[in-house]
């Protein structure tokens, strides 16, 4: 795919009629049915994502409709989730910062062959409000809350600690040219608010909040990282020091440092 016609269709001037795609029909159906719909783009980085997905990125950002052929427009409803699978090799393309800023990057590790074959894989058991997680349309107003509205969800002690942690990572990444702005901060905060609801809104949210912030460090802050030893070597050292309470992110940074030492260059997705 190199342009959005492969997702949204196009106007066939020979037949003088629109040519629709399965993705278009799914989106139109999701506008009529108020249960969750998922648009899954397999191997979405076989082409430059920005070339065929730019209209979606703009619509997600602005909450406006996607202009189509003629005067037609396409609404992206709140009950539609877009998921893309990605492989990184010599046949694929990396994502731009614009795409990474608007997504949660979830990395799936290769499991042990022995554990898989003997069915000894670790399986976490959810211990929070599972029904809240199962219905992704729950608490939709959270998506539109401003940072000041989100602040009111938490107690002052947590908010001070949380904002200090975000600032710490923002400053470290900014030094190397990988800083993040309001959009990323808002999305991280919404994620934390959803986690707080999943945890049944504990009166004092102490150590357990760090597991969710750990996920957001890895999914929202680190994915843009790439460069040579000179560019990000010191940054990785500072991040490693700051991630002692965040084991998932700490392990990722150690992995990146090892690759950097061997190859003199590293990116988040190796």
At which residue positions do the language-model features occur?
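AAA+ P-loop NTPase catalytic core and its hallmark functional loops
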Residues: 1-135
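Alpha-helical lid/collar subdomain of P-loop NTPases
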Residues: 123-270
